[in-house]
């Protein structure tokens, strides 16, 4: 199995299923930036990523609680309830919470991001290669754990 692939119990033997990623930001431009950075697939020949975009903390919590996701990408700069607080809540309350990639506003926020229990943190400005690499790595880690 190559990096970033997970097996679908309903697919034929050896076929990879598309990774499912939940993307939270109240800013449509921030969500678009992540989508463009990661691209449609994690690796050449892999299935297209199944993205679910949400813009409210309640939607993140409801979706993450379903257990359907391989990765959660949370915007730490979202208004009212940022991704740091949401990450902390999910890690405390959701059984077998998937990995969390937290996007912060600046490198100096890394110390605060550690409180969130996120599995990885990237600071703005986002480097598309770093975003793609982090997403692929976290999805692969989740696939091995699952």
Question: What residue ranges belong to the model's regions?
Answer:
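Alpha4 helix (beta4-alpha4-beta5 surface) of REC/receiver domains from two-component response regulators
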Residues: 105-121
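Conserved phosphotransfer microenvironments
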Residues: 35, 70-91
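Conserved acidic segment of CheY-like receiver
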Residues: 17-39, 72
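His-Asp phosphorelay/catalytic-motif detector in bacterial-type signaling
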Residues: 70, 94-99
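Acidic, metal-coordinating helix/loop segments flanking the phosphotransfer/catalytic sites
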Residues: 53-71
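Two-component signal transduction core modules
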Residues: 72, 121-122
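The C-terminal output helix
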Residues: 136-146
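C-terminal output helix
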Residues: 33, 126-135
């Amino acid at each position: 199995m190559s990096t970033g692939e997970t097996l679908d119990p309903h697919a034929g033997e050896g076929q990879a299923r598309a990774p499912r990623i939940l993307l939270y930001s109240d800013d449509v431009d921030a969500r678009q930036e992540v989508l463009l950075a990661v691209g449609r697939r994690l690796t050449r020949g892999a299935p297209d990523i199944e993205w679910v975009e949400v813009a409210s903390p309640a939607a993140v919590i409801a979706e993450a609680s379903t257990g359907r996701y391989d990765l959660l990408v949370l915007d730490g700069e979202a208004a009212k309830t940022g991704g740091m607080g949401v990450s902390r809540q999910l890690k405390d309350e959701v059984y077998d919470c998937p990995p969390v990639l937290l996007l912060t506003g600046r490198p100096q926020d890394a110390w605060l991001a550690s409180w969130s229990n996120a599995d990885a943190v990237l600071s703005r400005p986002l480097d598309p290669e770093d975003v793609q690499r982090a997403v692929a790595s976290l999805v692969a880690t989740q696939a091995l754990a699952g």
